[in-house]
Amino acid sequence: MLMSLSRRELIKKEIFDIEEYVPGRSIEEIASTYGLKPESIIKLGSNENPLGPSPKAVKALIEAAPGANIYPSADAHELREALSKYTGFPVSNIVASGPGMDGLLDGLCRIIIEKGDEVIVPIPTFSYYELPARACGAEPVFIRRNQDFSLNPEKILEAVSPRTKIIFLCSPNNPSGNLLPEADLRKIIENTDALVFVDEAYVEFADRNLAALVNEYDNVAVGRTFSKVFGLAGLRLGYGIMPEWLTKEYLRAATPFSVSLPALRAGLAALSDTEYLNKSINLAREGREYLKEKIPFKVYPSQANFVLVDVSPLKAKKVTESLLKKGIIVRPCDSFREAGDSFIRVTVGTPEQNEKVVRAFEISKSEV
């Protein structure tokens, strides 16, 4: 006898609680909306590397194309070995993930979270964390950051319950760009049995990282990506650094072949091009200081490849609209939970792009 199920009833109830992820707007969309030529548009809304990928990575992509009919290694072992040299951690502490760090988050939630669990998310921050958590049945517990976007470890620990499985932290934080102090992270790790996940997507641009704590504690994992400093956002490649026990369980349930052959080859080449890596880092560090000094609004200090601009008393949407009409894509932060309506995130571009965005902010300030 057939059961009478509506199509909606086929979907897990938790899915309907998910707020769809809002990405940065594309060049094609803005060109079509505002009648602009695509080549005239400056895209500074998604924290991409304005220099593009390393030429070595591009060459590796081209050379990998004829082998697209062959499966890559199931666990991307060759890339994990290269990441071991890059990070200083044994291969047994490293996993590679596609699509990007998002795939790592999906995998961790899949092996850790059960229906009725909780995850803790200090906000505003990267909004993807709650998506895989909710999809797996967890309830996010949101903790408001301080006025300067720093964390209050005591508030986070007060929110920990027997149902808490993962605490999501971001350093440098997106969209604010500030680092998580090591002392605060230690305090959180040492006072919970939950997994503490540290998102270091932008860490190459920062003065320090927190990955060494993986050697000291068995309940901390670090996520990283090739999308930012390595300029491979379109290939969706990420990796995790975690205790050996967690690596083992992650690989047990991981999607095999999740890292495509082109992504694997490009990742290997990008890791080998230290000159290009340093060039990208220096461009971002110099550019963020220029933007902080020149943009005619309050700009927060940043350790990432972007800056956060407070345009109050103006509204971010109106200023963003003014910039879009001038062919400059930036990111209004109203899609970040509890970020408010006066913040705009601006990716560091080339020196020429940075000059144009500063001038556009100056004009928009008088127009809006």
Swiss-Prot record:
Gene Ontology terms, MF aspect: histidinol-phosphate transaminase activity; pyridoxal phosphate binding
Gene Ontology annotations of biological process type: L-histidine biosynthetic process
Catalytic activity: L-histidinol phosphate + 2-oxoglutarate = 3-(imidazol-4-yl)-2-oxopropyl phosphate + L-glutamate
EC number(s) stated in the UniProt entry for this protein: 2.6.1.9
Top-rank EC class of the record's enzyme: transferase
Cofactor: pyridoxal 5'-phosphate
Gene3D superfamilies: Aspartate Aminotransferase, domain 1, Type I PLP-dependent aspartate aminotransferase-like (Major domain)
Pfam short name (any one): Aminotran_1_2
Membrane-spanning intervals of the chain: none
InterPro entries assigned: Aminotransferase_I/II_large, HisP_aminotrans, PyrdxlP-dep_Trfase, PyrdxlP-dep_Trfase_major, PyrdxlP-dep_Trfase_small
Record PANTHER family: HISTIDINOL-PHOSPHATE AMINOTRANSFERASE, HISTIDINOL-PHOSPHATE AMINOTRANSFERASE-RELATED
The protein's name in its UniProt record: Histidinol-phosphate aminotransferase
Source species of the chain: Methanosarcina mazei (strain ATCC BAA-159 / DSM 3647 / Goe1 / Go1 / JCM 11833 / OCM 88)
